[in-house]
Every structure is written in C-alpha cells, then in structure tokens.
Amino acid sequence: ALSFDYPNPKIEAEILINETGIQTDIAQKLVTIGTKIRNLTELGLTETVSTRLLIDAAKLIHNGLPKRLAVHVAVVEPLTDEQETIQALKDLCDLMI
C-alpha cells in the first residue's frame, strides 16, 4: 500500500504560489491554517484540509474574493455540515488570515 502525507509547510506554500500566483505571505498563512486544522483532533472531522482545498482558497483570493470569505467557502465549509464546528473553524481561520 502507498502512504501519502502532506508536503512540509515550505513546499506546500510553494505549491500554492506556483498554482495560483498568490503572494508568499498569504500562501504561508493558508498553509498555517491548513496545518492547524489538520492537527485539531478534538473536532472529530472525517475529512481534513487538503492541499487542493488550500489551492482553491488561494485561487479565490487571487481573483479578488476577500481572504476570510475565500477561506470560509473553500476550506471550512467543505469539511463539515455541523454549524457549531463550522463556526469554530471560521473563528480560528479569521484569527489566522
């Protein structure tokens, strides 16, 4: 069986920059958000933040969507339908972006 892990933060930020043209500081913040959510076992998420979700958020930001809204739509909402969890993740992301 093959086992895949997430790229280290520096490489993941470079992926976001190369795929979307996003600014380095924003790419780094998105990677930090992704890493933080991946490590939140308390929320019991069945899915977590993939590099693809971060790329989606970066594309939205690069195309002019406000950063917080882009993270909410592309990163937070695909992870769960539970309103309390969504709000907790939005609050976390708002502090980090």
Report each predicted region and the residues it spans.
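C-terminal regulatory/interaction module of P-loop NTP-utilizing enzymes
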Residues: 1-97
